[in-house]
Amino acid sequence: MFLPTTREEMKKLGWRELDVILVTGDAYVDHPSFGVALIGHYLVSHGFKVGIIAQPDWRTEKDITRLGRPRLFFGVTAGNVDSMVANYTASKKKRKTDDYTPGGSGGKRPDRATIVYTNLIKRFFPEVPVVLGGLEASLRRFAHYDWWSEKVRKSILVDSKADLLVYGMGEKAVLEIAQILSRTGDIEKCKSVRGVVWWASQKPEEGIELPSYDEISENPEKYAEALKLQTWYTDPYKNILIYQKQDTRYVVQNPPQLPLSQEELDRLYLLPFEREVHPFYAKMGRVKAIETVKFSITAVRGCFGSCSFCALTQHQTTHVSYRSKDSILEEVRILTKKKDFKGTITDVGGPTANLYGSSCSIRETKGQCQKFCLYPSVCKIVRPNHDEFISLLESIRKIPGVRNVFVSSGIRHDFVLAEKDPDVFIRELVKYTPGQLKLAPEHAHPKVLSLMRKPPVELFLEFKKRFETLAKKMGKRKYVIGYFIVGHPGEGWRENNYLRDFILKHLGYFPQQIQIFTPTPGTVSTAMYYSGLDPFTGEKVHVERSLKVRNKMKENVLFKKKGREKR
């Protein structure tokens, strides 16, 4: 079932009025990989009428008013990625293309889309509450360093003048908000909901206070301190309120929602998604973003890898939940009935596929402890369950109509090597790899890897050797390729040349999978970039801020110039 995008579609459903209207910076793709589709179907499954306005023209009222006034609230998201990341390259150049837009052309979403859409709604529907959500809002919920303007900005809740902000995976919080507003009509009563950020005129009586907006604007060290506190205390099982003064008000973060149970996750992903671009937007052109996920399966939600540059820790916390085998097999059966299904499940996974079935008795009862699960090495308390993941893949392959099953999402090779006999899983993984297994060592220099909170590169080499040796014995031409980041805090020319030499010596090919580090809001790496400090050790960190030098670092590793760069 497609959710309505026009009045005509509402009439066909017999809906005279909508309870909730969701506004997004992406095209409307009715697939569980897209946030508005998940939230929209979840609300509908609980009896609410929901419509979607995708990529509205922000220069006119035509699009934002086409579904009328919602009974309860507008929900606003910039889309699956931060709008500034969507609109600009790592060299701050305007992108000409957008994979989330029909036809692939850029310019269909505004910069700082969450703020722009909220202001547009407030202009034409000033009395209707606006609730923010999605990655952009979640990662900008407190005062944050904004690389594009090169300054610290206030909470996006304050800047946008929205009523509430939902952070993390928002199904439960948005449902509670809808239920409270349906009963009372009072947005103030929604400020007790877990997973919500709100503002207060008075300082909260309890909780953890972060350094204020003024403090972190004037002192980058305070920014590092704020990020550390936010990281440690944002945990559903610690149940701690966090707040930050901004001007004369306080931005208040309630404790996160508890992760969805397996039963809740199962029900969510089996809602009646069309797994297609909505016809209203499909007629405008192809949406490239659906092509890689259309016949994929989300088996895992969350990641406890805690990589410094990754937004997941701040967005979803470190808690991992996973679906039951029965639920996943039922979704595969649904996919096999699609007219354009060719027999291949392109991916079974999530942020990190081989965390499926893993558990930690401490994290799942008391919250994240004062150490990282996989750094500097795999914690002994974390229990992998690769057998269960392999059993799942084997069961999928036996379903009529399925010819191939692939694992294309992240694999933590250090987690595999922590097993007593890693080859048991690696041998099976060879069967489910589509030619090349993509791993993310990210760098080679020990200092940079330590700041990234990534395992030693020697583990990548060990895994690569095991995988390719087993593949050869099995008569399979399958290989491991690496993804790398340059320009990350801690990298100068010495470290960059070290990475170049490593690739030349150990990989034997010129890699194309090289990214320039982008300081996106809310991550540990961005705190390092702005403050010049490791937030968790207080040690000084070298930061390369010159766009010209950062681009040269990429060229150096891509072997576009002969010889090594001088340091």
Curated annotation (Swiss-Prot):
InterPro entries in UniProt: Elp3/MiaA/NifB-like_rSAM, rSAM, rSAM_horseshoe, UPF0313, UPF0313_C, UPF0313_N
Cofactor, how bound (note): Binds 1 [4Fe-4S] cluster. The cluster is coordinated with 3 cysteines and an exchangeable S-adenosyl-L-methionine.
What are the protein's UniProt keywords? 4Fe-4S, Iron, Iron-sulfur, Metal-binding, S-adenosyl-L-methionine
Cofactors named for this entry: [4Fe-4S] cluster
PROSITE patterns documented for this protein: RADICAL_SAM
Question: Radical SAM core domain: from which residue to which, for each copy?
Answer: 288-560
Classification via SMART domains: Elp3
Binding positions for [4Fe-4S] cluster?
303, 307, 310
List residues traversing the bilayer. none
Q: Its domain of life?
A: Bacteria
State any single GO MF term. Answer: 4 iron, 4 sulfur cluster binding
Which family, according to the similarity comment?
Answer: Belongs to the UPF0313 family.
Kindly provide the name given to this protein in its UniProt entry.
Answer: UPF0313 protein CTN_0332
- Organism listed in the record: Thermotoga neapolitana (strain ATCC 49049 / DSM 4359 / NBRC 107923 / NS-E)
